Amino acid sequence: MIHGQLTTLRAIEREDLDALWRWYNDAEAMYYWAEPHKTMSREDLDGRYGAGLSASTGRAHWLLITTREEAGRGETIGRIGYVDLDRRNRHTEIALMIGERDYWGRGYGSDALIAYLGYLFHELNLHKVWLRVEAFNERALRAYEQCGFGRDGVFREHTFLGGRYYDSIIMSILEDDFRERYPFVAPGTR
């Protein structure tokens, strides 16, 4: 488990699939995740996650974001993970989603992100972490910049949603920048 001040990041378990299914079928949540909304059956979700709940492919790995509870289990509110881990060049792309609307804009995503970056830089010894965010997602852009990500470039008209194309902003943070900004973040905790 990885702990932030507000959040805990943990392995996805079978009982978490109901929350994931709810988020995948929430048109607004998926819009901000930059995924075209389509209804996903519970069977499709079970097939997508069933075999790999606690397994990592080595190049991709997903964790659940929960509210931090000192005793017991917190509320499931989102997911975070890396994709295309490149160990040779020491970088990866990450993505996160707060699926529970009651937690949007309240700092839970930023808290989970900072805790996860601590893990990626300290435990996986990465040099750079990067992400893509659609230009219309101003709340996410502000949050990523406040967490120390800089804008590296733009994939013009990269994502097609709701009948139109949107630019995708490429952002990254380097290990040295993270350590300077967050010297207090120990591996796996905050």
Q: What residue ranges belong to the model's regions?
A:
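A short coil/beta-turn micro-motif at the C-terminal edge
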Residues: 14, 135-137, 165
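Amphipathic alpha-helical recognition patches that constitute DNA-binding helices
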Residues: 19, 93, 111, 128, ...
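Conserved acetyl-CoA-binding loop-helix of GNAT-fold acetyltransferases
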Residues: 105-119, 138-146
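Short, conserved glycine- and acidic-residue-centered signature motifs
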Residues: 87, 109, 113, 164
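Conserved catalytic-core motifs of GNAT/GCN5-like acyltransferases
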Residues: 130-133, 150-166
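Conserved GNAT acetyl-CoA-binding A-motif
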Residues: 122-132
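GNAT-family acyltransferases
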Residues: 1-102, 173-190
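Conserved active-site tyrosine of GNAT-family acetyltransferases
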Residues: 144, 149, 171
